[in-house]
């Protein structure tokens, strides 16, 4: 038997044969090496303190049974000697598994085992980590023993003197390094030595060890991730059944969890409120309205939360460990779990907060509980209610809050009027309730108080500055505010109050005994009885100023009020922070991590688990944990209208759909934008195809298409064009303005297409010249392009001679175009067509002409640029055919002979004549290009000349009073009449400064002279310039760069001098010259660097300091000097001090000089514009040889594609559209006169029509059939092709326009069905129409409303709004009813502004609240109090919630609201408790557009939801709470959940669903 076997036999009490068996098979010899003290017993579990002073507690006792025979490889000797990877493979039985040990990816052995008495240890999660910790700790212990053995050997005496080993491979150093590495891992744990013992009864080996946690008691512990993970897995009590009790749905794949939260709260509220025994009377004193039963339930719940009926008997004297956990979680911080000690451990168990790391003993927790109970008994610790009243909108949350205030008023003792807070501020206890609400409903709160509880004394707090106007001190303001029962303020005011709330005068350092000012907010010096946040979701995040200020305010009770308190995951932190639920109101942010993890999972489309759990520092945290907090601590209740329908009696709300058709002008405008979208997105008209754009791009286009359904001009387009019309921004764009805009857009596009076609043609010819080297072919191409350009300029712009020097190409000058730019009318061979095409003189004709002139100048300028390029390249072609041949002959002859070449000896006579002719043509074409270049640049050159002339006039030496140069300061530097050293020092400083300023003046004026020479130089060349230069403009442009750089540098240096001069004149501290005189990173030219180095800048003591010292000296002198010398001394000091007045004059003078430099800067800007245009011309002439191979290939592909017919088709189509648009005004009149537009082929009515370039109209199908067989117009016989056809929709009949909404549409019914989108769930369009009709009612009087006459048209939707308002007003007058009041909701602020202008035009009194400003509440209050105000314009997102507007019986939803909650909020403004009449919602929709697609698709989603509910056996009721019983996956039923953006899976349907 080996020695090791004997050791094992003795220590483990087993037979030697068994030990030798294991040793022979390589089982445990290396294990024994790692465990040097096998004969020691395990560490006593009573050990309490670690070596570093931290306390210890046993967190895991591991006993693993291993079979007697182990299949072990030779590598198994590495166990515990090196860090190993351990994997646990679970077996069928919970306490059995397979242990897999590997090292360096090599499997060492597998052991089947089972756990003994370790039910808390999760085999699959905890055990691998625990074993890994054990391996680390035992290896560290072995290495420390090894190191100690080496040291003990070195300490033995030796006769030989050993040298100190400095080798980096020294074993001792390596050991220390390895020990250090191991000590950094799992530093929060200690592990006992591993003990092997043999169990004779089970014939197994048992591996045992204890794992202990090192911790600091009554302190925050920063545990490692591994420590938190083991503690969380071992001790966290996660009761899944508790959650499922109130929440029936699996979890979602989205951050948007509003429906899930409210579904849970509704379930909880039913259970919680049913347990409350009613105790409120039927009528509440001082409340002028009786509460409904469900309202009494809510008030009773809040009263109980605030301590009603609670007595000390409710708090037991002694509580167990479970009770302590609940107490600590509710009253201190959420997250405490119990770490129980094992029976053989000494000491109390621990409470560990998994979110903060704080640990305390159960004894300490019991002490805190006893202290709390004692304070409750003495009244020092009142019950502090925290909660959210989340009643559905319209159920009377305001009345419930007022009832709470009336029923539970604070009783204060005079002896306890104040207390000192943690920041040493004196806080006054008050009876007051602080209500914070949005601006929009602040007045509404005051009205409700006056109407229902006018015994309550209230005050509107408007901020620190306002209240301090009436109070002398902050303490006085506090005493004044304490007198009120209610203080009402807004979120905006609270946000501005945050800095005053943070101010603390008790910690301000000061030299005086009492502070001069106190900027403390009076709100921060009061302890309110309760704070109520109405629409609490308005806090948005805990980092906003409103949230910060609210958190600083002292209160007893904390309430939030909102119908939708939780919308997304991050709202949990906002609500919990406001309710002061620790640790969520502190820095630890588990919720943000959870939100980000879910976002990442969604982006990866990882939906493998319904309940997503994230880990923060090893601690598990999920949405379930967030939701559980609310019912675990009774934080929120809610009633829905569906639940209390039997108690409330709200009259019916009618939901009308108003389908409208575009007028022909609007329809063409929409189709043009739609076609642009299709072209850019890659979709086909039926929704097929592969999009090439992002979802953000699609959302942007959807927004544009939705806006154009409301008004045909985008705000930015309208603004730009009205500015061109001399700034008439207040003018409303009517339908004629829209037509003008459409024509201008079409004409602008046509110019672009023509420009592109000619440009590509020039590049094609240039390719033939430079790359193909075929000058003869290139010559032919360029001549054709030149001729085509000349014809185009003559026909399109009526310009006969492009070389006319009087031609005006300026786009920005105010003078009108010459008559040469007048439009030519399209001729036609038919009299009726000429009558249609004959334009009327409309009121906006001048505006049309001005915009047209602007665009035509722009187009002519583009064509002139192309003509210039063409002439230049023609010169290049003739150069290749003429001059270049002579140059090649010269070069060849120069190499062979010295004498000059005789060209007649080289070329035949006829060829030489041809060369000479080509040389003359070369010069002629280059000259023509130069003339055109000057003509193109003439407007920019004129601007430069005008600005130079203006500057010369302003700065004329004899007539100008405008300062440009600096002036010297006169000063006597020699005679110093100072009476003392102080004055003398001032004299010398002043003398030095003035001397420096005068030198600086000289420096400035010299630079200015240099600037004037350069800046006054003209930009264009004279007629004597060599116009035959082939590189036109290159030399000029090169010179201009140098000139512009000099001007820029000089202007910059002059400004630096003025700035330095201002500092010397006005600074109160020492002036320092900046290290960098120009911004860092700026490119500095050599010339600019020289200028900067030559600047004369002044540093040191400024003038103001000198004058201050001089004044101080005079004060001292007056006290000490005699009267005899007073007069002389004073005169000298006064002489010096007069320069103080002079310095102020110099500062003003510097300001005037700076303004003068701005005039010179305008010359620089004008020159820059000129040279930029010159550079663009030069860039257009770049040789193709300078392009890279990919660039050249791309150019060739573009030429082949575009010139192959694509551009011609676009040009033909848009020319036909221009003719159509020109005739639309006449067609509009035809429609108004009830005339019919007939097709000349089939003689039928034109509905879906087409127009060709000659201006004739036909049915679309007729003309397409005709042109397939003919190439001429059926009427005028003019040539035309299919590419010239422009299609349009034209409906005349009112009956067709207002088809019954329930009728099925058959056109294109299947267009969207082939799409693979899974949301296209209804294939039968008649079923879609049925769903559409089920949700909305039909307004049967819609035709009568259409017949109402209005004096001007602004578009289909705006026109009908005006007509419907007029109809409602006339109807109310006939019925002797009150005048109607209407709320107009839209998501487009700019559209509401347009509506407001139209309402004003028709004398319809209205008010607008487009954003949540300070006066919005007053505006809404005026609407409620003044029946004469017909309309209130509101923005859906900013003012859709919280308003009580039951005075308005009508709500206009001007455009589809994407988010269901926002839509219901808007519809609920008048459909609430207190409404005694039927109300009406009018949904405006433009047929055959994205608006109709959106509304239809929302109906389909509702049907899908209804079907899924029916499958689950749940009853679906449309009247139910909008968020009750919803499917948990919101993305399936919500088109939009954030900021009116459509989610990815619904985008396609919004564009194409049900499209024709």
From Swiss-Prot:
Biased composition (Low complexity): 1310-1319
GO biological process terms, semicolon-separated: DNA repair; double-strand break repair via nonhomologous end joining; double-strand break repair via synthesis-dependent strand annealing
Loss of function: phenotype: Displays increased levels of spontaneous RAD52 foci in proliferating diploid cells.
GO CC annotation terms, alphabetical: mitochondrion; nucleus
Locations listed in the record: Nucleus
Domain named Helicase ATP-binding: residues: 378-583
Lineage, top ranks: Eukaryota, Fungi, Dikarya, Ascomycota, Saccharomycotina
Family the UniProt entry places it in: Belongs to the SNF2/RAD54 helicase family.
The protein's name in its UniProt record: Uncharacterized ATP-dependent helicase IRC20
């Amino acid at each position: 038997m080996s020695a090791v076997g004997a050791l094992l036999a003795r220590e483990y009490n087993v037979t030697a044969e068994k030990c030798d068996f294991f040793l022979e098979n390589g089982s445990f010899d290396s294990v024994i090496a790692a465990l040097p003290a096998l004969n020691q017993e395990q560490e006593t579990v009573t050990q309490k303190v670690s070596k570093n002073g931290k306390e210890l507690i046993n967190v895991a006792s591991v006993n693993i049974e291993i079979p007697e025979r182990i299949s072990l490889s030779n590598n198994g000797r590495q166990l515990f000697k090196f860090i190993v990877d351990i994997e646990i493979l679970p077996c069928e039985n919970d306490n059995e598994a397979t242990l897999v040990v590997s090292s360096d990816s090599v499997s060492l052995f597998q052991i089947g085992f089972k756990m003994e008495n370790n039910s808390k240890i999760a085999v699959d999660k905890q055990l691998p980590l625990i074993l890994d910790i054990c391996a680390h700790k035992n290896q560290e212990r072995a290495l420390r023993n090894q190191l100690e053995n080496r040291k003990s050997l070195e300490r033995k005496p030796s006769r030989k003197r050993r040298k100190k080993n400095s080798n980096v491979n020294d074993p001792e150093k390596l050991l220390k390094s390895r020990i250090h590495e191991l000590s950094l891992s799992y530093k929060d744990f200690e592990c006992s030595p591993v003990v092997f013992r043999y169990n004779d009864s089970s014939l197994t080996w048992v591996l045992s060890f204890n794992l202990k946690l090192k911790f600091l008691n009554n302190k925050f512990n920063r545990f490692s991730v591994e420590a938190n993970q083991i503690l969380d897995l071992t001790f966290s009590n996660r009761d899944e059944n508790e959650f499922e009790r109130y929440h029936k749905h699996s979890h979602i794949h989205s951050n948007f969890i509003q429906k899930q939260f409210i579904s849970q709260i509704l379930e909880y509220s039913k259970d919680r409120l049913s347990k409350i025994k009613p105790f409120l009377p039927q009528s509440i004193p001082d409340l002028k309205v009786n509460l409904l039963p469900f309202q009494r339930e809510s008030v009773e719940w809040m009263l109980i939360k605030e301590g009603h009926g609670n007595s000390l008997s409710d708090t037991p004297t002694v509580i167990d460990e479970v009770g302590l956990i609940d107490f600590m979680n509710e009253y201190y911080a959420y997250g405490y779990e119990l770490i129980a000690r094992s029976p053989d451990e000494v000491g109390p168990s621990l409470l560990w907060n998994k979110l903060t790391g704080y640990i305390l003993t159960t004894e300490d927790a019991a002490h805190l509980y006893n202290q709390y109970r004692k304070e409750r008994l003495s009244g020092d610790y009142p019950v502090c209610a925290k909660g959210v009243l989340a009643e559905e909108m319209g159920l009377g949350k305001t009345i419930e809050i007022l009832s709470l205030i009336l029923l539970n008023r604070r009783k204060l003792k005079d002896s306890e009027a104040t207390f000192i807070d943690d920041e040493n501020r004196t806080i006054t206890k008050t009876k007051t309730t602080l209500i914070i609400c949005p601006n929009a409903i602040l007045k509404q709160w005051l009205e409700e108080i006056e109407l229902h509880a006018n015994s309550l004394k209230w005050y509107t707090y408007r901020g620190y500055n306002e209240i301090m106007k009436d109070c002398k001190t902050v303490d006085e303001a506090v005493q004044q505010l304490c007198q009120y029962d209610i203080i009402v303020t807004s979120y905006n005011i609270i946000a501005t109050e945050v800095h005053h709330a943070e101010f603390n005068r008790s910690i301000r350092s000061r030299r005086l005994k009492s502070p001069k000012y106190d900027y403390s907010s009076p709100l921060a010096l009061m302890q309110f009885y309760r704070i109520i946040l109405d629409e609490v979701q308005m806090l948005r995040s805990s980092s906003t100023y409103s949230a910060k200020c609210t958190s600083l305010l002292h209160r007893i009770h904390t309430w939030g009020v909102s119908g939708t308190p939780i919308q997304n995951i991050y709202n949990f932190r906002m609500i919990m922070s406001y309710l002061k639920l620790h640790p969520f109101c502190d820095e630890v942010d588990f919720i943000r991590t959870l939100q980000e993890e879910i976002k990442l999972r969604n982006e990866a489309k990882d939906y493998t688990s319904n309940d997503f759990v994230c880990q923060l520092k090893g601690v598990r945290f999920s949405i379930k944990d967030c939701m559980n907090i609310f019912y675990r601590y009774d934080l929120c209740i809610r009633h829905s209208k569906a639940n209390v329908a039997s108690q409330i009696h709200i009259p019916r709300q009618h939901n009308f759909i108003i389908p409208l058709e575009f007028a022909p002008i609007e329809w063409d405008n929409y189709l043009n934008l739609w076609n642009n979208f299709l072209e850019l997105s890659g979709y086909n008209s039926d929704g097929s195809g592969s999009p090439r754009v992002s979802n953000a791009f699609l959302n942007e286009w959807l927004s544009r298409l939705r806006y154009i359904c409301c008004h045909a001009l985008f705000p930015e387009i309208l603004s730009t064009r009205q500015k061109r019309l001399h700034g008439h921004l207040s003018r409303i764009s009517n339908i004629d303005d829209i037509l003008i805009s459409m024509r201008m857009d079409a004409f602008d596009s046509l110019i672009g297409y023509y420009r592109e076609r000619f440009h590509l043609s020039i590049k094609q010819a240039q390719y033939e010249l430079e790359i193909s080297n075929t000058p003869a072919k290139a010559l032919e191409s360029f001549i054709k392009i030149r001729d085509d350009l000349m014809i185009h300029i003559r026909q399109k712009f009526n310009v006969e001679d492009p070389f006319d020097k009087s031609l005006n190409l300026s786009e920005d000058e105010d003078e009108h175009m010459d008559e040469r730019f007048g439009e030519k009318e399209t001729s036609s061979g038919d009299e009726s067509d000429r009558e249609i095409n004959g334009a009327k003189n409309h009121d906006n004709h001048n505006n049309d002409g001005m915009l047209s002139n602007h665009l035509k100048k722009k187009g002519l300028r583009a064509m002139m640029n192309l003509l210039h390029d063409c002439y230049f390249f023609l010169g290049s072609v003739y150069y290749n055919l003429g001059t270049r041949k002579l140059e090649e002959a010269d070069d060849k002859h120069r190499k062979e002979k010295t004498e000059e070449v005789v060209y007649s000896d080289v070329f035949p006579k006829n060829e030489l004549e041809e060369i000479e002719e080509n040389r003359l043509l070369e010069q002629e074409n280059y000259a023509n290009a130069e003339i055109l270049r000057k003509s193109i640049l003439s407007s920019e050159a004129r601007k430069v000349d005008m600005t130079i002339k203006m500057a010369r006039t302003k700065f004329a030496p004899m007539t100008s009073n405008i300062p440009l140069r600096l002036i010297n300061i006169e000063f006597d530097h020699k005679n110093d009449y100072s009476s003392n050293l102080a004055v003398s020092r001032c004299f010398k400083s002043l003398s030095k400064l003035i001397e420096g300023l005068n030198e600086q003046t000289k420096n400035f004026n010299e630079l200015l002279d240099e600037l004037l020479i350069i800046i006054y130089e003209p930009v264009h060349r004279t007629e004597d310039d060599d116009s035959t230069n082939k590189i036109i403009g290159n030399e000029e442009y090169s010179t201009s760069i140098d000139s512009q750089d000099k001007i820029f540098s000089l202007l910059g240096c002059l400004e630096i001098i003025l700035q330095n001069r201002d500092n010397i004149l006005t600074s109160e501290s020492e002036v320092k010259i900046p290290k960098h005189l120009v911004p860092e990173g700026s490119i500095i030219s050599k010339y600019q660097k020289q200028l900067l180095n030559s600047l004369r800048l002044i540093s040191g003591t400024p003038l103001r300091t000198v004058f201050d010292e001089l004044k101080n000296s005079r004060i001292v002198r007056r006290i000490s000097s005699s009267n005899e010398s007073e007069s002389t001394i004073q005169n000298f000091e006064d002489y010096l001090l007069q320069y103080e007045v002079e310095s102020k004059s110099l500062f003003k003078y510097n300001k005037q000089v700076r303004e003068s430099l701005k005039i010179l800067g305008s010359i620089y800007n004008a020159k820059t514009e000129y040279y930029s245009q010159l550079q663009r011309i030069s860039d257009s002439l770049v040789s193709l040889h300078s392009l890279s191979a990919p660039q050249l290939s791309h150019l060739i592909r573009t030429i082949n594609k575009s010139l192959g017919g694509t551009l011609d088709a676009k040009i033909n189509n848009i020319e036909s559209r221009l003719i159509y648009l020109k005739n639309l005004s006449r067609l509009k009149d035809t429609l108004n006169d009830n005339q019919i537009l007939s097709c000349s082929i089939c003689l039928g009515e034109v509905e879906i029509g087409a127009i060709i370039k000659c201006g004739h109209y036909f049915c679309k199908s007729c003309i397409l059939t005709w042109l397939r067989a003919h190439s001429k117009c059926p009427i005028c016989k003019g040539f035309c092709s299919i590419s010239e056809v422009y299609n349009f929709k034209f409906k005349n009949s009112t009956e067709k326009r207002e088809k019954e909404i329930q009728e099925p549409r058959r056109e294109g019914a299947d267009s969207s069905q082939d799409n693979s989108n899974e949301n296209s769930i209804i294939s039968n369009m008649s079923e879609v129409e049925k769903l559409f009709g089920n949700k909305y009612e039909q307004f049967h009087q819609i035709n009568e409303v259409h017949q109402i006459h209005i004096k001007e048209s602004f578009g289909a939707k705006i026109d009908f709004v005006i007509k419907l308002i007029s109809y409602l007003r006339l109807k109310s007058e006939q019925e002797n009813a009150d005048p109607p009041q209407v709320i107009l909701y839209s998501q487009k602020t700019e559209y509401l502004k347009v509506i407001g202008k139209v309402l004003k035009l028709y004398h319809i009194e209205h008010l607008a609240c487009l954003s949540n400003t300070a006066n919005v509440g007053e505006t809404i209050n005026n609407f409620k109090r003044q029946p004469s105000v017909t309309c209130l314009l509101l923005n859906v997102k900013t003012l859709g919630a919280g308003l009580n507007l039951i005075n308005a019986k009508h709500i206009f939803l001007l455009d589809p609201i994407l988010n269901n909650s926002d839509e219901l909020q808007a519809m609920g403004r008048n459909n609430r408790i207190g409404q005694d009449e039927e109300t009406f919602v009018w949904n405006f929709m433009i047929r055959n557009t994205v608006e109709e697609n959106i509304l239809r698709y929302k109906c389909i989603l509702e049907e899908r939801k209804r079907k899924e509910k029916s499958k689950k056996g749940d009853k679906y009721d449309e009247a139910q709470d909008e968020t009750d019983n919803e499917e948990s996956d919101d993305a399936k039923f919500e088109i939009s959940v954030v900021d009116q953006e459509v989610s990815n899976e619904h985008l396609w349907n919004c564009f194409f669903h049900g499209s024709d």
